[in-house]
Amino acid sequence: MTKVLNIKKTITGTILLLSFVLGNTGAYATDNTSSNGYWLKKHITSVEQRNRIPRGLLSAIVGVESGFNPYAVNIEGKTITANDKSKAVKTIKNAVNQGVTNIDIGIAQINYRWHGDNFKNIEEMLNPATNIEYAAKLLSSLFKQHGTWHKAIRHYHSANPNHHKQYSRKVVIAW
């Protein structure tokens, strides 16, 4: 009887663990019709290879930045939960209309103030493929500018050491 209870506990624990892990894989739909988390991770890997970014680094950054949520929005340090693109666009436009420019947008959390001019519009910034491509080019340019991937990671988040120390640790652990 004890063995049966232990087996049931083990099976229950395994199911709970798998539910948690699989439920948090970041499998969000993207702008790529009928895409899913698998497409997203495959795309990130492809972008890493094309831009000569070490395997898994861009994926780690995206995971830390947004949890793989293509509609992630952060306004002046406050995370806004947007479940779809239209809600994210509306939230961002409202903030911009109020004069706010410190807005991190999309799956790789590209900052509107510093990088918004490199996109046609907010919708393009929220497009996961475009957002990831831009993040890769930004990360590569930071690597060239600062000489190491660890420094590039820090500066991807912020040039301010008080802001990037904890962030870079999270990314390195995820990497």
Question: Which stretches of residues belong to each language-model region?
Answer:
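Boundary at the C-terminal end of the N-terminal hydrophobic targeting segment
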Residues: 25-29
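Short, contiguous, well-ordered secondary-structure segments
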Residues: 1-3, 22-24
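Bacterial N-terminal signal peptides that target proteins for export
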Residues: 3-14
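Bacterial N-terminal signal peptides
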Residues: 13-23
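Catalytic glycan-binding domains that act on GlcNAc-containing polysaccharides
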Residues: 30-175
